[in-house]
């Protein structure tokens, strides 16, 4: 998260971590140990688990987003995952007034997934929120970590 043109980060590893915002009370267990985090519903790993439970064991999230993007079951999975992300975006906007959001990661940068995030955000709020793709693609987190380490 960027606030006042600087990476927002405290010593706690989860401060500023959008994916670890609880979006569903007593929800699915997340890798961080909490329940109901966005990441437990909308990450590549979370979608892989959904695919395995729906007898799509041989299909990865990336494969689904490329080769099965127009199937009914794929659209449902994408819609549900992106709704959780959209809720998180609207919550951050409501709490902080932040209106610009950058989406990264291999899943978030997928055209259909990204488009659904925007669509679902517009369904939830009338606020003028700008959502764009990370310019550094999958390397944005690496460069962010490097920038942060140079500050310390």
Positions of PLM-derived features:
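Short beta-strand scaffold segments in enzyme catalytic cores
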Residues: 1-2, 21
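A short, polar/charged loop-to-alpha-helix boundary motif
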Residues: 14-26
């Amino acid at each position: 998260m960027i606030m006042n043109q600087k990476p927002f980060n405290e010593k706690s590893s989860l401060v500023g971590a959008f994916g670890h915002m609880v979006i569903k009370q007593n929800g699915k267990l997340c890798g961080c140990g909490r329940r109901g985090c966005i990441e437990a519903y909308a990450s590549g790993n979370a979608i892989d688990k959904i695919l395995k439970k729906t007898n799509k064991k041989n299909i990865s999230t990336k494969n689904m987003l490329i080769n099965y993007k127009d199937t009914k079951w794929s659209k449902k999975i994408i819609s549900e995952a992106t709704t959780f992300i959209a809720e998180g975006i609207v919550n951050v906007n409501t709490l902080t007034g932040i209106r610009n959001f950058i989406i990264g990661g291999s899943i978030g940068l997928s055209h259909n997934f990204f488009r659904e995030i925007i669509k679902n955000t517009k369904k939830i709020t009338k606020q003028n929120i700008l959502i764009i793709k990370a310019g550094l693609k999958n390397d944005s987190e690496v460069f962010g970590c490097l920038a942060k380490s140079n500050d310390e």
